[in-house]
Swiss-Prot record:
Lineage top rank: taxon: Eukaryota
Keyword Zinc-finger: yes
Chain's role: Acts as a transcriptional repressor. Involved in the early stages of mesenchymal stem cell (MSC) osteogenic differentiation. Is a regulator of podocyte gene expression during primary glomerula disease. Binds to promoter DNA.
Name of the protein this chain belongs to: Zinc fingers and homeoboxes protein 3
Organism, scientific name: Mus musculus
């Protein structure tokens, strides 16, 4: 075995050398095992050797889009025989399989320390995972006795870079740490929390020349550069099917962590590597601990992380269920785990940092909605964002993102500094938050081409950084504004500049629901698209409605964005916005301490409100104003506000709904589409529906009394006109008109027709059986087909226009909630006494009745046998038939007596038809009980009469 030397730097990973006897053959590729360190398999050819050596050109690493370096930077896999180099394991294996024919010979794997024999590298990997899980490196010696390749594995005496169990082995230049994301530097303790620094330029040290020169067949092995999900170091495998393991997702914030005292300036160094495009990556690995800049964390305010909590099953299950626990979940975990709540919060924060989880409050709420189908309000976690100037010089090149749970800290870019940062920290005095202190920080960046300082960030930037405002101060000392109110990362992305936000906020203060003209004006001023403007208004309204206290927006000096956590600037709920809008200056929107605070609720509700419960007086005033101008000016709105005692928002909402209704009605009139099966009755039904829509609007938003008086005043012709020719069309037909009411009642329609009904339109009086059949079909389908119409016409004997009209009236009544019988018929609760008789049986009974005019007792059994009906049903049918005949005779006698006594014709007609109409649309199922109820009667429409019906 060749000699092995330690690096002069104690923290450097030692170089491993594998001795190969002269019988060795081809080199084998680098393989990875999740439980052990990553090694190169020894070569199998005496003249070929392979090593995983650092590539000086790749020490900078592969740059990701967010500025972090790839986990594969620093080393390449090299075949010394071919001088072939590859940074990807799969690519290197492909080379070995194609170029070296003896590579595929299966060796036997032997662990000399445990006398363990394995036939394949997978078996040895499992053995290493079970018996050598704590070892950091292995030494492989390849022999070839009897032409059979044997790989002997031994554990070296010293492994200065051993990694604790459960930790991630990352690249040789990064920091190896425990799972603790926030820690204190414990000097003088050789325990898990001690940080080992691995020298970054170790592969390029000249001391490496002092290594013994490998003999023929010897090869040098260096650990590769991979991280693994389970946190363990990789081992050696010889399978050609292996792929690069996925990178670790637990890259916590690490480094020297000084405490940031309040009011004291400290300097922080940020080292940024130049970006290098990643090669051979199917996906971008997450940033490692080395590539993350170091961020200051006030450790005095954060409890010590307890590593023992990682094995708690309650905590792990809760985190896997949802990474952001609610208050109730924290209380439950406090009880079952016996850990304090603050310790639990720190643990959850650490786990989220490991997994790279950083969600906004909206994302947390949406995720809870999707997972639990509930809405749980969560308090947004304050964040700290650090950016240096070269990163924001290009809107799409924002690479650094550092977030930590620091309450009340904000980071900005002070003017005049090339790489400086401005960190603010709140000052607490007697429990009250005073004005903020600004702490300048310096950053060291790799030299880059100079870029001019910018004041804005492009609106189409797709970065994940919370707030960006480069080359200008993000904080001004203002006594009335707290530093915690300075930054609301949940509302503002880095999409809009100060000028854009000023224009948007100025418009939002005037009207939270901008019109189309205002949106177009904002798009011209800000350069944003219409969709972005509307989305900004929607998001802003959402936060005003859901946050504990609505946050007023005030632009401050030097382009800083200031958001007050207490609403000092009231939002006037104006309904109209002038066409020409002036963009206010930065000082015009600043709230002074003497500003009178409005008394409106701090969390206004922007949900739509129904206005049907308004008093008739209010509706009358609103209707009059709407008739004059559907878009009232400001003076009219003020007058309506004082007269109706309604709020500005309510008035604006009422006018908006009213305009929508008018537009809807106009659209319906323009379209005028009708079902094809209603062609014969389309004209009459269209007039009914059109009139119903006209009358329904005042019933909802206006005063019925005012509308009725207006309609009666316009009527020129009295509707009470009797055409004697139409008094008796059939023995079962008639028409009811009440002269006392002064309007003409349609038979099935509950609306008052304000026009004279044409004499040619005849309303048919329907029997209880006919209504029963119609209702049964209506429950089955509200829009019958042509076949349904033909069938119901055959069953009832009614003409098609009458059936079509009845269905139209019933649909309208159902829409307005006036069809009382619908639910009972839908449940199958039919009125007593109604028979469902087949057409053939009805003809038999009808013929018998026309012959005998009454039911003979001796013929009862014969009729029962022929019709398959019971005796009670046959008797009931004859009773109903005789009742109809009696009513018809009464109609004739009343008509004959009317002119003879000299009374008005209309009065006699009403007296004669009043009872005959009782059975038309009765809602009562007692045949002998007349009821004053109308099935399509609309209470919201103006009514001056009521139909009386009974079965």
């Amino acid at each position: 075995m060749a000699s092995k030397r330690k690096s002069t730097t104690p923290c450097m990973i030692p170089v491993k050398t594998v001795v190969l006897p002269g019988a060795s053959t081809e080199p084998q590729p680098v393989e990875s095992l999740p439980e052990g360190p990553q090694q190169d398999l020894p070569s199998e050819a005496p003249d070929a050797s392979s090593e995983a050596a650092p590539n000086p050109s790749s020490t900078d690493g592969s740059a990701l889009a967010n500025g972090h370096r790839s986990t594969l930077d620093g080393y390449v896999y090299c075949c010394k025989e071919c001088e072939f180099r590859s940074q990807d394991v799969t690519h290197f294996i492909g080379h070995m399989n194609s170029e070296h024919t003896d590579f595929n010979k299966d060796p036997t794997f032997v662990c000399t320390g445990c006398s363990f024999l394995a036939k394949n590298p997978e078996g040895l990997s499992l053995h290493n995972a079970k018996c050598h899980s704590g070892e950091a490196s292995f030494l492989w010696n390849v022999t070839k006795p009897d032409n059979h390749v044997v790989v002997e594995q031994s554990v070296p005496d010293s492994a200065s870079s051993s990694v604790l169990a459960g930790e991630s082995t990352t690249e040789g230049t990064e920091i190896i740490i425990t799972k603790t994301p926030i820690m204190k530097i414990m000097k003088g303790k050789a325990e898990a929390k001690k940080i080992h620094m691995l020298k970054e330029n170790a592969p390029n040290q000249p001391g490496s020349e002092a290594l013994p020169k490998p003999l023929a067949g010897e090869r040098e092995v260096k650990e590769g550069d991979h991280t693994f999900i389970n946190g363990a170091a990789p081992g050696s495998q010889a399978s050609a099917k292996s792929t690069k393991p996925p990178p670790a997702a637990n890259g916590p914030l690490i480094g020297t962590v000084p405490v940031l005292p309040a009011g004291i300036a400290q300097f922080l160094s940020l080292q940024q590597q130049p970006p290098v495009h990643a090669q051979h990556h199917t996906h971008q690995p997450l940033p490692t601990s080395k590539t993350l800049p170091k961020v200051m964390i006030p450790l005095s305010s954060i409890p010590t992380y307890n590593a023992a909590m990682d094995s708690n099953s309650f905590l792990k299950n809760s985190f896997h269920k949802f990474p952001y626990p609610t208050k109730a979940e924290l209380c439950y975990l406090t009880v079952v785990t016996k850990y304090p709540e603050e310790q639990l919060k720190i643990w959850f924060t650490a786990q989220r940092l490991k997994q790279g989880i950083s969600w906004s409050p909206e994302e947390i709420e949406d995720a809870r909605k999707k997972m639990f189908n509930t809405v749980i309000q969560s308090v947004p976690q304050p964040t700290i964002t650090v950016l240096n100037t070269p990163l924001v010089a290009s809107a799409g090149n924002v690479q650094h993102l550092i977030q930590a749970t620091l309450p009340g800290h904000a980071v900005g870019q002070p003017e005049g500094t090339a790489g400086g940062l401005l960190v603010t920290q709140p000052l607490m005095a007697n429990g009250l938050q005073a004005s903020s202190s600004s702490l300048p920080l310096t950053t060291a960046s790799v030299p880059k081409p100079t870029v001019a300082p910018i004041n804005t960030v492009c609106s189409n930037s797709a970065s994940a950084v919370k707030v960006v405002n480069a080359a200008q101060s993000l904080l001004t000392a203002c006594p009335s504004i707290t530093s915690q109110a300075f930054l609301d990362a949940n509302i503002y992305k880095n999409k809009k500049s100060h000028e854009q936000l000023s224009a948007l906020k100025g418009s939002f203060c005037r009207n939270q629901f901008p019109g189309q003209s205002e949106v177009e004006h904002l798009t011209k001023v800000t350069g944003l698209s219409t969709r972005e403007v509307r989305k900004w208004f929607s998001d802003r309204r959402y936060h005003c409605r859901n946050l504990k206290g609505s946050r007023a927006m005030m632009p401050g000096e030097h382009g800083s964005v200031l958001i007050d956590s207490v609403p000092e600037v009231p939002f006037p709920l104006a309904s109209k916005v002038p066409e020409v809008t002036c963009i206010p200056t930065a000082t015009s929107l600043v709230s002074h301490p003497a500003t009178k605070r409005q008394s409106w609720h701090q969390t206004p509700d922007f949900t739509p409100t129904k206005y049907k419960e308004r008093a008739p007086e209010q509706l009358r005033v609103l209707e009059n104003s709407f008739a004059q101008n559907p878009l009232p000016p400001e003076e009219e709105l003020d007058r309506l506000r004082s007269e109706t005692k309604m709020t500005r928002r309510e008035i604006d909402g009422w006018f908006s709904e009213r305009r929508k209704k008018v537009n809807t009605e106009e659209t319906k009139k323009a379209d005028g589409h009708m079902p094809k099966e209603e062609e014969e009755g389309a004209e009459q039904e269209g007039r009914d529906e059109e009139l119903a829509n006209e009358l329904r609007v005042p019933g909802e938003n206006g005063s019925p009394e005012m509308f009725l008086s207006h309609a009666l005043a316009e009527r020129k012709v009295s509707p009470i006109k009797i055409n004697l020719k139409n008094l008796r069309v059939t023995e079962a037909s008639g028409k009811s008109e009440f002269p006392g009411m002064g309007v003409c009642e349609p038979e099935e329609d509950g609306l008052n027709k304000l026009v004279e009904q044409p004499p040619s339109k005849v309303s048919y009086k329907k029997t209880a059986q006919q209504r029963h059949l119609l209702r049964q079909l209506f429950v089955q389908t509200q829009w019958p087909s042509n076949q349904d119409y033909d069938s119901i016409m055959a069953q009832t004997g009614l003409p098609r226009p009458e059936v079509v009209r009845w269905f139209g009236d019933s649909r309208y009544a159902l829409k307005n909630g006036q069809l009382k019988w619908y639910e009972d018929y839908k449940r199958g609760n039919f009125p007593p006494g109604l028979l469902v008789i087949a057409p053939g049986n009805r003809e038999l009974l009808q013929d018998y009745y026309m012959t005998h005019k009454m039911l003979c007792e001796e013929d009862l059994q014969t009729l029962c046998d022929k019709t398959q009906m019971s005796a009670q049903q046959v008797k009931q049918w004859f009773a109903e038939k005789m009742g109809e005949e009696t009513r018809a005779v009464a109609d004739i006698s009343s008509e004959d007596q009317g002119p003879r006594n000299g009374e008005p014709v209309a009065v006699h007609k009403v007296l004669g038809d009043a009872y005959s109409e009782l059975s038309e649309n009765s809602e009562s199922w007692e045949p002998s009980a007349p009821e004053a109820s109308s099935e399509p009667f609309d209470t919201s429409s103006p009514q001056s009469g009521r139909q009386l019906e009974a079965d």
